[in-house]
Amino acid sequence: MAEAGQPRPLTAFAPPPPLWKHFTPDNLKRLEEVKKEASKGEDGKPRKKKWTPAELRALQLPPELRFLVPPEIPMSGQYSVFGELQSLSTTLPSLQEQGIEQLYPSTPTETDPNKPSQPSRPFNHAYYLLKISKSLLLNFLEFVGILSITPEQFQSKVEDLRNLFINAHHLLNLYRPHQARESLIMMMEEQLNRSREEIQQMDKMHAEINGFLEQLKAQGIDVDSASKSGENDTAKRTTGDQDANNANSSRLVWDILDGTD
């Protein structure tokens, strides 16, 4: 058995932390029972509640169940990736802080962070990235020449190549905020253009609907006038029929009276 102080071997895929052994069905069931018990109201019935990690950490849990609760998010410190320590800080350290020679000029803020920034020419990342790329090609050709003539003197040229790659990678990381801003500007412009197209389509649809309503309105006026004229004709025809009927009735009455005489 390996000793506790013995470092773990580096592997392509790191092993899971030991606490995974506590994620058993029984422990998960017990945690749900504790959550139901803690969520009971005054009537003694459990209520549906969405637990936050902070609320779960505040519960009185046994040690084997505490591993099932998400821990607090670390805000500082370091973590290990394949045996290399990485910092949680999002601030990009300078090459000088890492003890690496910087092959491109520093910006005013990198030279003196406490000095108030003044308007200056923007740093051209692409220009220096291109120069470093050309230097990489030249140094690689020199490296191949050294290997073909004096292979034992390769170490210095390997260091030069390593330094060039690190500088190029650092320049790319410095360029990421600018790239993020440009990507955000492009995304907002696309949203603005899409909103303008939607507004134009809505205006077009509004005009079509107004034209259709005007057409219906005009057709409705014609129908109303036609129906009114039809009603007048019907009324006149009905009045004439009634007059004829009245006349016939009167004539019959006079005929009857004449017959009785």
Swiss-Prot record:
One of its GO terms (biological process) is regulation of transcription by RNA polymerase II. Transmembrane segments: none annotated. GO terms for molecular function: transcription coregulator activity. It is found in: Nucleus. Residues 1-55, 224-250 are annotated as: Disordered. Residues 241-250 have a biased composition (Polar residues). InterPro entries: Med7/Med21-like, Mediatior_Med7, Mediatior_Med7_sf. Residues 23-45, 230-240 have a biased composition (Basic and acidic residues). Keywords: Activator, Nucleus, Transcription, Transcription regulation. SUPFAM superfamilies: Mediator hinge subcomplex-like. GO terms for cellular component: core mediator complex; mediator complex. Component of the Mediator complex. Component of the Mediator complex, a coactivator involved in the regulated transcription of nearly all RNA polymerase II-dependent genes. Mediator functions as a bridge to convey information from gene-specific regulatory proteins to the basal RNA polymerase II transcription machinery. Mediator is recruited to promoters by direct interactions with regulatory proteins and serves as a scaffold for the assembly of a functional preinitiation complex with RNA polymerase II and the general transcription factors. Belongs to the Mediator complex subunit 7 family. This is Mediator of RNA polymerase II transcription subunit 7. It comes from Neosartorya fischeri (strain ATCC 1020 / DSM 3700 / CBS 544.65 / FGSC A1164 / JCM 1740 / NRRL 181 / WB 181). The gene is med7.
